[in-house]
Amino acid sequence: MASSDTAEATRRDFLYVATAAVGAAGVAAVAWPFITQMNPDAATIAAGAPIDIDISPVTEGQIVRVFWRGKPIFIRHRTAKEIQSEEAADVGALIDPQPDSARVKPGKAEWLVVYASCTHLGCIPLGHQGDWGGWFCPCHGSQYDASGRVRKGPAPTNLPVPPYEFVDNTKIRIGAGVA
């Protein structure tokens, strides 16, 4: 009988292990969809990813609008006259004092990249408008200069500068360094 008990014990152990393995696989199969549904989908990941913009077709004086993370961005190719005017502006007289050099990349003063939403209530300003030739918000009359600094109206702050970098002389990466 001893050999029969050993065989029965071995068979019983095997059934315990097999049942536990099937049970674990079943739990994993049921849990897997719940775990994966907590991950962001591909559209969400892509929406926050940096984007590269080819700026070679943007002529001097032109403003283009692109979208990053669902928000509009202005890219302005400033003229030498605009750069000179903005660098000479009295920073102390501004509503939100900020020098022109703090709003552009060193050596690339001809390119200005800012969010295209008025800092008052989020309307999209019109380019090459207003008393300073920058942007004019048609909703409540805020005016920005060619550096995106608020000059007049209810807007409390300058147009924000998004994180960006120059990949090369003809390409800007918006969202660089953002996780």
Curated annotation (Swiss-Prot):
<keyword id="KW-1003">Cell membrane</keyword>
<dbReference type="GO" id="GO:0046872">
    <property type="term" value="F:metal ion binding"/>
</dbReference>
<dbReference type="InterPro" id="IPR006311">
    <property type="entry name" value="TAT_signal"/>
</dbReference>
<feature type="disulfide bond">
    <location>
        <begin position="123"/>
        <end position="139"/>
    </location>
</feature>
<keyword id="KW-0001">2Fe-2S</keyword>
<keyword id="KW-1278">Translocase</keyword>
<dbReference type="GO" id="GO:0051537">
    <property type="term" value="F:2 iron, 2 sulfur cluster binding"/>
</dbReference>
<keyword id="KW-0472">Membrane</keyword>
<keyword id="KW-0249">Electron transport</keyword>
<protein>
    <recommendedName>
        <fullName>Ubiquinol-cytochrome c reductase iron-sulfur subunit</fullName>
        <ecNumber>7.1.1.8</ecNumber>
    </recommendedName>
</protein>
<dbReference type="InterPro" id="IPR014349">
    <property type="entry name" value="Rieske_Fe-S_prot"/>
</dbReference>
<keyword id="KW-0411">Iron-sulfur</keyword>
<dbReference type="InterPro" id="IPR019546">
    <property type="entry name" value="TAT_signal_bac_arc"/>
</dbReference>
<keyword id="KW-0813">Transport</keyword>
<keyword id="KW-1133">Transmembrane helix</keyword>
<dbReference type="InterPro" id="IPR006317">
    <property type="entry name" value="Ubiquinol_cyt_c_Rdtase_Fe-S-su"/>
</dbReference>
<comment type="function">
    <text>Component of the ubiquinol-cytochrome c reductase complex (complex III or cytochrome b-c1 complex), which is a respiratory chain that generates an electrochemical potential coupled to ATP synthesis.</text>
</comment>
<dbReference type="InterPro" id="IPR019470">
    <property type="entry name" value="Ubiq_cytC_Rdtase_Fe-S_su_TAT"/>
</dbReference>
<keyword id="KW-0812">Transmembrane</keyword>
<comment type="similarity">
    <text>Belongs to the Rieske iron-sulfur protein family.</text>
</comment>
<dbReference type="GO" id="GO:0008121">
    <property type="term" value="F:ubiquinol-cytochrome-c reductase activity"/>
</dbReference>
<feature type="binding site">
    <location>
        <position position="137"/>
    </location>
    <ligand>
        <name>[2Fe-2S] cluster</name>
    </ligand>
</feature>
<feature type="binding site">
    <location>
        <position position="120"/>
    </location>
    <ligand>
        <name>[2Fe-2S] cluster</name>
    </ligand>
</feature>
<feature type="transmembrane region" description="Helical">
    <location>
        <begin position="14"/>
        <end position="35"/>
    </location>
</feature>
<comment type="subunit">
    <text>The main subunits of complex b-c1 are: cytochrome b, cytochrome c1 and the Rieske protein.</text>
</comment>
<keyword id="KW-0479">Metal-binding</keyword>
<dbReference type="InterPro" id="IPR017941">
    <property type="entry name" value="Rieske_2Fe-2S"/>
</dbReference>
<feature type="domain" description="Rieske">
    <location>
        <begin position="80"/>
        <end position="173"/>
    </location>
</feature>
<feature type="binding site">
    <location>
        <position position="140"/>
    </location>
    <ligand>
        <name>[2Fe-2S] cluster</name>
    </ligand>
</feature>
<dbReference type="Pfam" id="PF00355">
    <property type="entry name" value="Rieske"/>
</dbReference>
<keyword id="KW-0408">Iron</keyword>
<dbReference type="InterPro" id="IPR005805">
    <property type="entry name" value="Rieske_Fe-S_prot_C"/>
</dbReference>
<keyword id="KW-1015">Disulfide bond</keyword>
<feature type="binding site">
    <location>
        <position position="118"/>
    </location>
    <ligand>
        <name>[2Fe-2S] cluster</name>
    </ligand>
</feature>
<dbReference type="InterPro" id="IPR036922">
    <property type="entry name" value="Rieske_2Fe-2S_sf"/>
</dbReference>
<dbReference type="Pfam" id="PF10399">
    <property type="entry name" value="UCR_Fe-S_N"/>
</dbReference>
<dbReference type="GO" id="GO:0005886">
    <property type="term" value="C:plasma membrane"/>
</dbReference>
